[in-house]
Amino acid sequence: MPGGCSRGPAAGDGRLRLARLALVLLGWVSSSSSTSSASSSSSSAPFLASAASAQPPLPDQCPALCECSEAARTVKCVNRNLTEVPTDLPLYVRNLFLTGNQLAVLPAGAFARRPPLAELAALNLSGSRLDEVRGGAFEHLPSLRQLDLSHNPLAYLSPFAFSGSNASISAPSPLVELILNHIVPPDDKRQNRSFEGMVAAALVAGRALQGLHLLELASNHFLYLPRDVLAQLPSLRYLDLSNNSLVSLTYVSFRNLTHLESLHLEDNALKVLHNGTLAELQGLPHVRVFLDNNPWVCDCHMADMVTWLKQTGVVQGKDRLTCAFPEKMRNRVLLELNSADLDCDPILPPSLQTSYVFLGIVLALIGAIFLLVLYLNRKGIKKWMHNIRDACRDHMEGYHYRYEINADPRLTNLSSNSDV
């Protein structure tokens, strides 16, 4: 058995050497794999860093000269003398105030951004000295509900200002409230066009404002309302026309404003409301009309309106309405008037009026000719006046002389003896 004993130790040594070799190989593989993984990770790190740096920052920055509140979704750029709309508005903005600036012109796409300001719902541009609003100025604002352009002297308001640059293909405006108080420009900037007509064209173009609920047009010196100014506003509920210079509502129609709830006509120059207007107002199911501080003329033309006022519940504060003219009716309450109080001065027939006008012209012409003749003969007239004055003086001196003789008896006797 010695041979067996000799093979045992040799076999054990061989197995030990194999085990050591396996451990060496395993250590080399692990080290090489760790080295390669480390090198690969280190080589990929610059790529990840560059990719991270290539991504644009989140668009939540606040424009210079503005105040931002992400919690309130509000940006205020107030009284900063801005000459254009900031281009770096945050995407979260829902309420944007750009009041008290120097914008002058609002061009097409003034608020167009990529991505768009999809959350912007209320835009206030009042008092920013805007004198021109071009077509498509408010495009790409899909959520805009309230727009305030008050206190801007708008010499030019494009017909497509609210409907887009091409009204024939543009979608309806999302506007619900439009505030245009005191936008009348100075007389020297009206560019030979009717201000009332310009505003009306912007309201009806493309039927873009059919969803409008509130429209304020106060303090614009309107003398009249164009015939179709309200024709494309069927959803209107609140209409403010106060503090203008409206003399009559004869040409405008309220018939299609079936949802109208408040109509403000205070502080105008209305003298009377005629039957057509009265019937239209009475036909609106929910309306309340405010007519205070108008110079009502209480003559025979007021009879129908007085009767209507006594019967209707449409007019708010109707007991405060008083007469302004004629003088004898001043401060009389309209509801207290009777038909006998409302009379008119007799009107001359048109032919007789024409005759009187012609007679006045003839008399004025004769008077002008007479004055011209006097002026041309002023020297002769002056000489004639002097001659008359001298003749009168001689006559008066002779009269006084005879009076003195007759008044003295001695001179009278002497005169008699002289005659004898």
UniProtKB/Swiss-Prot annotation:
It comes from the Eukaryota. LRR repeats lie at residues 92-113, 116-139, 141-163, 172-204, 209-232, 233-255, 256-275. It is found in: Cell membrane. The chain crosses the membrane at residues 356-376. The modification Phosphoserine is found at residue 418. Residues 35-355 are extracellular. Keywords: Cell membrane, Disulfide bond, Glycoprotein, Leucine-rich repeat, Membrane, Phosphoprotein, Repeat, Signal, Transmembrane, Transmembrane helix. Residues 1-34 form the signal peptide. Residues 53-91 form the LRRNT domain. The keyword Cell membrane applies. The keyword Signal applies. InterPro entries: Cys-rich_flank_reg_C, Leu-rich_rpt, Leu-rich_rpt_typical-subtyp, LRR_dom_sf, LRRNT, Wnt_signaling_inhibitor. One of its GO terms (cellular component) is plasma membrane. PROSITE patterns: LRR. Disulfide bonds join 62-68, 66-77, 298-323, 300-344. SUPFAM superfamilies: L domain-like (SSF52058). It holds the Pfam family LRR_8. It is a single-pass type I membrane protein. Residues 377-420 are cytoplasmic. Glycans are attached at residues 81, 124, 275. Residues 283-346 form the LRRCT domain. GO terms for biological process: negative regulation of canonical Wnt signaling pathway. Highly glycosylated. The C-terminus of LRR N-terminal cap (LRRNT) and LRR 1 are essential for the inhibition of the Wnt signaling pathway. May function as an inhibitor of Wnt/beta-catenin signaling by indirectly interacting with LRP6 and blocking Wnt3a-dependent LRP6 internalization. This is Trophoblast glycoprotein. The lineage of its organism: Eukaryota, Metazoa, Chordata, Craniata, Vertebrata.
